[in-house]
A protein has these predicted regions:
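N-terminal pre-catalytic "stem/leader" segment of glycosyltransferase-like enzymes
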Residues: 1-67, 71, 92, 258-280
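Membrane-proximal helix-turn-helix segments that form the acceptor-binding/catalytic region
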Residues: 105-129, 136-138
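Conserved catalytic-core segment of nucleotide-activated headgroup transferases in glycan assembly
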Residues: 157-222
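Catalytic binding pocket for nucleotide-activated donors in carbohydrate/polymer assembly enzymes
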Residues: 234-299
Length: 400
């Protein structure tokens, strides 16, 4: 908790690289390693309402969060400033519309169900959405058109500098020492979606004179080293893979690629370049991510003042001085009048025509009703709801 309290930025994920060496976890770690702010990591299953309440002034980044109590999502939306890095399709109960169809025999309709609605609301409430590929963003926005309004960026998979440097060394060694021609690699995935059998079959059908080998059971760097010895990589996932690192690594190493359209970053301009151009693009991604966070921290803070009036001229309140005092430091001042008949409303209207930061509204009430005290609170609530600033400053009209 000490790390949490001292942090400016909070990373929330189901697992981190110490727990599992998957592509998502490597991207998360690559971003964490170059954090320009004090940043802590929290497992999604450990997040609770108390932490959210203590972290309202922090900036939160949500990665994979299936393990998080989804009942916390409305609390997060209402109280936190946050961004989401979307690695897959969390609105689907299978996190893959293709797996959904494979398992049920029906097209995915999760976007119409409660899960889809709560996940889309979580995305829509964020300061920024980071996608893995343009195709992924299109699939989301087709099902949830309101997400088009969100600030969003295609981030792609992110690589650490040491990983890119290691891959570059392997590429240079490969150019000098050579590689096994007519020999294709297939990466042994731990998920049906990786399409190992289909990848092997594609090599046999496309290059019948070539051999194919399935690589697995190796550490990350050993796998890259072994991969560099092959002529090409075959990767035919059975469903949409948002931005698979494997094909990026193979391309950086200089291998030929035999891939299908389920590789969803296929066709993006950066991925069509040579190894140096792809590396140049990847080197920019951490900065693109952290610039969004920096823009949040360095944003101008807007402040709205608000108050209420009712026959304040007749009451001889210092109402003009009260409003003027807020205009001295607020970006806008909202005044809700309760139905004045002593000239107050006319004075407010005339003043607002000369002062564009003064926003005046009238909500008439029956002040002779026995609920007049409740009406007073409701007037303040109306005024507050009309404020557009990030922060609000309330004053009674007899205060200066």
């Amino acid at each position: 908790m000490e790390n949490f309290r001292a942090s400016d930025v909070v990373f929330v994920a189901d697992m981190f690289l110490d727990d599992y060496g998957g592509g998502a976890e490597r991207t998360t770690e690559a971003l964490f390693e170059v954090a320009p702010y004090t940043t802590c990591k929290i497992k999604s299953q450990d997040l609770n309402q108390k932490m959210i309440e203590e972290g309202i002034n922090k900036f939160w980044i949500f990665f994979n969060y299936r393990g998080m109590d989804h009942n916390l999502i409305p609390v997060i939306v209402a109280n936190c400033n946050y961004a989401i890095v979307e690695y897959d399709y969390k609105y689907c109960q299978y996190r893959s519309i293709d797996l959904h169809k494979r398992e049920t025999g029906e097209e995915c309709d999760c976007h119409n169900l409660q899960l889809g609605k709560i996940i889309s609301a979580f995305l829509h409430g964020s300061e920024h959405i980071f996608w893995m590929s343009k195709k992924q963003s299109e699939i989301y926005c087709e099902r949830f058109p309101f997400l088009i309004e969100n600030n969003q960026t295609v981030l792609s998979s992110v690589f650490s500098i040491p990983d890119l440097e290691y891959i570059e060394r392997l590429r240079k060694s490969r150019a000098v020492d050579g590689y096994s021609e007519n020999n294709w690699a297939v990466i042994d995935g731990n998920s049906w979606i990786k399409g190992v059998d289909e990848s092997v079959k594609s090599v046999n059908e496309t290059f019948p004179e070539s051999t194919v080998e399935v690589l697995g059971g190796l550490s990350y760097y050993d796998l890259l080293k072994e991969l560099s010895k092959f002529n090409g990589l075959s990767f035919h996932p059975l469903g949409g893979d948002t931005c698979p690192r494997t094909v990026i690594e193979a391309s950086l190493l200089g291998l030929e690629l035999l891939i299908n359209e389920n590789v969803q970053n296929l066709g993006e301009e950066w991925f069509g370049g040579d190894s140096d151009e792809i590396e140049d693009y990847l080197l920019t991604r951490p900065q693109v991510f952290w610039d969004v966070v920096t823009n949040f921290f360095e944003r101008p803070i807007s402040l709205s003042g608000y108050t209420t009036t009712k026959n304040v001229i007749q009451s001889d309140y210092p109402w003009q001085a009260s409003i003027q005092s807020m205009l001295c430091f607020c970006d806008e001042v909202v005044v809700v009048d309760g139905g004045s008949n002593d000239g107050t409303w006319q004075e407010l209207e005339n003043w607002s025509k000369k002062e564009p930061r003064l926003k005046v509204y009238q909500v008439k009430r029956d002040w002779d009703d026995y609920r007049f005290a409740i009406f007073d609170g409701q007037q303040k609530a109306v005024a507050r709801s009309l404020c557009k600033g990030e922060w609000c400053w309330q004053m009674d009209i007899d205060e200066v």
